[in-house]
């Protein structure tokens, strides 16, 4: 998209950086009736994001409108059917439009009752806290009440390191799955809740289907080593690609 947005080809480096974002923001939104290179790029992007039946016609017809709406719905964006700046960013990069209004956040510090209320007043609905970690990183029992009383929903995150392929294996997944199970029980996390295990780096291809998948097989085995009525379900906290592959393998909810 860099080359198509008046960035000279010698400047196009494959990075979706500030120059590309600036040029992309100046492009008019694609809508039904649009045609040309930008539509073709949008169609390729939708295919890359799992919309395999999208045509590569370069024409923004009713079928493309519906595919864009489905993509926006899945990405929790405003459903307009327009391929606007925010939608473009979501198609191209996992972090999407970094200036968009968000509904969720995560933090590695204790959330007071006052802070929880401020988060809710700011429009947040979900907050992520860590089950393990040094210092204030891990959640305390009192925070459950602070979060709940403010009308927020908690999504629990498990992360020891989980930041490289070396930290991804079946044995580590099993060990950490058991730790998450114990930690959830100690904190009083409702049984059946999803614990989101972090993949804090950007693996691709065989790295996801290999070591990362092996780690989550270990996590799943650990959580399923006790009756489901006394356990939790595995989720993943990572890039869109990682989440999609692991879900397609049946390893996460």
What are these regions (language model features)?
Residues 3-8:
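Short, small-residue-biased leader/transition segments that mark boundaries at the very start
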Residues 12-32:
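Feature responds to low-complexity, polar/acidic, surface-exposed segments characteristic
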Residues 29, 34, 74-75, 80-122, ...:
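Boundary/entry segment of secreted carbohydrate-active catalytic domains
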Residues 38, 45, 102-106, 125-130, ...:
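Structural recognition of the beta-strand scaffold that forms the well-ordered cores
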Residues 107-110, 131-134, 159-162, 200-202, ...:
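Active-site beta-loop-alpha junctions enriched in small/polar residues
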Residues 135-211:
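Substrate-binding cleft of extracellular glycoside hydrolase catalytic domains
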Residues 182-189, 202-253:
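Surface-exposed substrate-engagement region within the catalytic domains
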